[in-house]
Regions:
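Catalytic domains that recognize anionic headgroups
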Residues: 1-367
Length: 367
């Protein structure tokens, strides 16, 4: 409605396809598996540069790019798989993305373009450099395509998941002898029952026009604030409905009252195959301020309850829920307001729904 030419580059996953439906120009890239997926090094980087150079980029434009290069399982191109690019595979993939970001910026007029860099979630980086979840033979069987989710197929997946869990448990017990509890949690998955800052504290960079100086803003902000900030920076109507707010005052050295951030864990394959009534809502929900993080089970106020003092315990190693009942009550009030305001729900999942969800979870590593 604002006469912007909208284009995007996203992976071939249903979620991304659906929310980019109304873009003027959409490029979908392959994300089938590690061996066949497209990434910056083998194709996508050149395509992005070609798009930025093309005459089809009618001003004003917005180009949304969702890259999966820094995503488990980590696959590092040979030219970046070197010590000089970082200690771990994750570090080396960050180096790869950094190089390509520089190439993209060389094709952009920074005087009339706003660039926003962020991530939809963080990642656990194994302390040993290798994930204990990767058990090749079981992984291949789990990712084997199926035409339906039959009773036999569900039992097969349950068996494989149980085998993998047993292997993971054995590996963890061995590692506990030499690693600290903090190091041990680096082997967790995003679909576990926790939301440490490793997963939810992500980078957020605004640069280009209307950003007059370089600085680091320490204030707590949220992903839902990104879109309202862009709208404000380019001067569009600020009446567009959104769950967030503009961060432009912070960018312009003004103060904003802190707003708490809502969070929830992802779901995993076990939730779909180990239950007679599969659910797609996250098991754990929570809320974070600059001082505290509060988590609990979605459907039980007294289950999996945790409270962390982020000022005095930034690594979130001590649960103080029994020591701070007043803070727990306050944080629960904030969280309850979030859940009250949300209008989402979940219906019954068909076998076809489970099949599609399983395929997506396998692709994204939520297993």
């Amino acid at each position: 409605n604002s006469n912007y030419y909208t284009c995007t580059l996203v992976p071939d996953i249903a979620f991304f396809k659906e929310f980019t439906t109304n873009f003027d120009d959409k490029m979908i890239y392959a994300f089938e598996n590690v061996k066949t997926r497209q990434n910056l090094g083998n194709d996508l980087g050149k395509k992005i540069i070609a798009k930025l150079k093309s005459k089809g980029m009618k001003e004003p434009w917005i180009y949304y790019i969702h890259l999966m290069d820094i995503h488990t399982p980590f696959s590092v191109p040979s030219e970046f798989d070197k010590q000089e690019n970082g200690e771990t595979k994750y570090d080396r993939l960050v180096s790869l993305v950094d190089v390509w970001l520089g190439r993209f910026l060389n094709e952009i007029n920074m005087e009339n373009t706003i660039i926003v860099v962020s991530a939809d979630h963080g990642e656990y980086i194994p302390a040993t450099g290798e994930s204990i979840s990767e058990i090749p033979n079981i992984q291949r069987l789990l990712t084997k395509g199926q035409t339906s989710i039959s009773f036999i197929e569900k039992m097969r997946m349950k068996t494989l998941l149980n085998l993998r869990f047993a292997a993971q448990t054995y590996r963890k017990e061995k590692l506990k002898r030499t690693l600290s509890p903090y190091e041990m949690r680096s082997f967790n998955t995003r679909s576990a029952l926790d939301l440490y800052d490793e997963l939810v504290r992500v980078p957020l960079i605004f640069t280009g026009c209307n950003v007059v100086e370089s600085k680091v803003i320490p204030d707590l902000v949220r992903s839902v604030d990104i879109f309202p900030t862009i709208i404000d920076m380019i001067g569009l109507c600020n009446s567009i409905k959104s769950d967030g707010r503009s961060l432009l005052p912070l960018i312009n050295n003004k103060k904003l009252d802190e707003l708490p951030a809502y969070m929830e864990v992802g779901i995993n394959l076990a939730q779909l195959v180990n239950s007679k009534t599969p659910k797609v809502l996250a098991k754990i929900i929570g809320v974070r301020t600059s001082e505290y993080k509060y988590l609990r089970a979605r459907d039980n106020l007294e289950k999996n309850v945790r409270l962390f003092d982020l000022k005095n315990d930034p690594l979130e190693e001590k649960n103080i829920v029994d020591e701070k009942p007043k803070i727990v009550k306050k944080m629960e009030g904030i969280l309850s307001q979030f859940t009250k305001d949300s209008k989402g729900g979940e219906g019954t999942l068909t076998d076809e729904d489970i099949k599609k969800a399983k395929e997506t979870l396998l692709r994204l590593g939520y297993i």
